[in-house]
A protein has these predicted regions:
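Metal-ion/cofactor- or nucleotide/acyl-coenzyme-handling active-site neighborhoods
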Residues: 1-188
Length: 188
């Protein structure tokens, strides 16, 4: 299972040439076919529905608002803690996409989960497009993503997570677990 984030590192990869089941985040449907699309933002759900995407996952509290067959509930978190970053409402599409993948498959490949800004600016292939911030905006604080994705890795110790990124990308120390590995994009 390939789980696709929207970091700039994946911008030169032709996702249509990767032939395996895919979970993607938000606007990735604009560029390639995704089997399962995760949208935690209502505007993105509406865009995906307008595009006719057949399988959209969103927050349970919003899925029923759409009353539309392809819109499904995201899975519940395995555990909920007491911190703000443990609250399901504060989980974004990226961490939820990895969680969904872990429920579906025991071998997860991840691409486009760059986390960090570039020159302190937004790091997203869809910057400057509908529903996204300007590429001139400051980088998003990545601490919630690091924490939440680390939770998924620990909740699924029998699942293998292989992250593909550039050679200079630093994997967060919280992700350095026995079931998580890092490889370069050319190995994808």
């Amino acid at each position: 299972m390939l789980v696709i984030g929207n970091g700039l590192s994946r911008s030169k990869i032709d996702l249509n040439k990767i032939y395996q089941e895919k979970i993607g985040c938000n606007a990735v449907f604009r560029d390639c076919y995704i089997d399962h699309l995760v949208c935690c933002d209502k505007r993105m759900v509406k865009q995906a529905m307008g595009h006719g995407h057949p399988s959209i996952y969103t927050r349970p509290r919003w899925a029923d608002d759409f009353n539309h067959e392809p819109v499904q509930h995201l899975p519940n978190l395995v555990e909920e803690g007491s911190d703000r970053k443990d609250d399901p409402f504060h989980w974004g599409s990226g961490p939820y996409a990895i969680l969904l993948g872990a429920f579906m498959d025991a071998n997860i490949q991840m691409v486009g989960f760059d986390l960090y800004g570039v020159d302190k600016k937004i790091n997203n292939v869809y910057s400057d497009t509908e529903g996204y911030k300007s590429s001139d905006n400051s980088a998003t604080d990545h601490s919630y993503w690091v924490y939440q994705i680390a939770k998924v890795f620990t909740w699924f110790p029998q699942t293998t997570f292989r992250i593909y990124n550039t050679p200079e990308w630093d994997m967060p120390k919280e992700w350095k677990l026995a079931n998580v590995s890092l490889d370069t994009l050319d190995k994808l």
